[in-house]
Structures are given as C-alpha cells and as structure tokens.
Amino acid sequence: MIPCTIRYEFIQKFNVSAQRAFVWCTDYRPDDMKLMKEENATRRVQRIANEVLILFDTFVDKERKGIEKQKLVCIYPKRLTWTSTHLTGPNKYSQFIYEVTALAEGKSQLKFTALSLDYENRYKEDTERKSKAVKKGDAKKWKLLAEEMEKDTC
C-alpha cells in the first residue's frame, strides 16, 4: 500500500537562548518520555557517533500491545538543527526537521517541520483531519517540553 503524506509545521517559542535551547533539545535521555507526559512509554538511547543516535521508543497501547518506533537522529550543531527519521513503526520513513533560531532579548524558537507517512488512511479527507490532529498533538508536546526547559535551565 502506498502511504499518504501528512505535512505540517509549527513554531514553538522558548524563553532561553538559541544555543541553550538546542543543547537542551538534543540531549536525549531515557526519561524524556516523562517530560512529554507519556506515561505508557519508554525510551532507550543508542549513541552511534558524536552527533548520530538511534532512539528506541516503546509505547504501550490500550490493548497492552507494545509499539516500538526506532528513530535515526542526526544533529547539526553549527546550524542548530537536527532531523529524526523513523526507521520502524507505524510511520516508517517519516522525517521531522527541527530548527532553532535566535530571537531578540536572548529568546529563541523552534521551527518543527513534519513529513509523516500514514499507511492506514487512503482518503484525502482523512489525511487532512489526521494532519490537524497530529500537528495539535506534537505542538502540545513541544509546549510541555518548553516549560520543562525553562525549569531546567533557569
């Protein structure tokens, strides 16, 4: 089956400098899921090289089935950018781009760009509805992460 493409983007503002935001965001740890209020999820981090890692995220659904997503993360410090490409899971081969930029007064923002592949929906209407829903969910997680970042870096 050919997947449908779901594209969306949003901006999340941070009350910390671009460099601090970038370092905080790319410091992947096993307890990251708790920061996003993902109670039924775990994360394992495998460092491949200094700026390359694989995330093994496991989510337990309502039927108590485990869904594992393996993500290849490539970090570009000079650009304050990183990518996350799904290697396995329900959104296999989806890719997400994260770009941190400086704002005035020592603040910054993240531009989140998603190209998500949906193997379940085949109708344009379903894809548009799902795009809005996943964008809202991802934006909510980044809002939580922004709050945690402020607590952690102040």
Name these PLM-found stretches.
Residues 1-50:
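Hydrophobic ligand-binding cavity/cleft-lining segments
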Residues 29-30, 41-87, 145-154:
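Glycine-rich portal/gate segments that line the openings of hydrophobic small-molecule binding cavities
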Residues 21-25, 72, 82, 110-112:
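Hydrophobic pocket/interface hotspot
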Residues 85-140:
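Beta-strand/loop substructures that line and gate deep hydrophobic ligand-binding cavities in soluble
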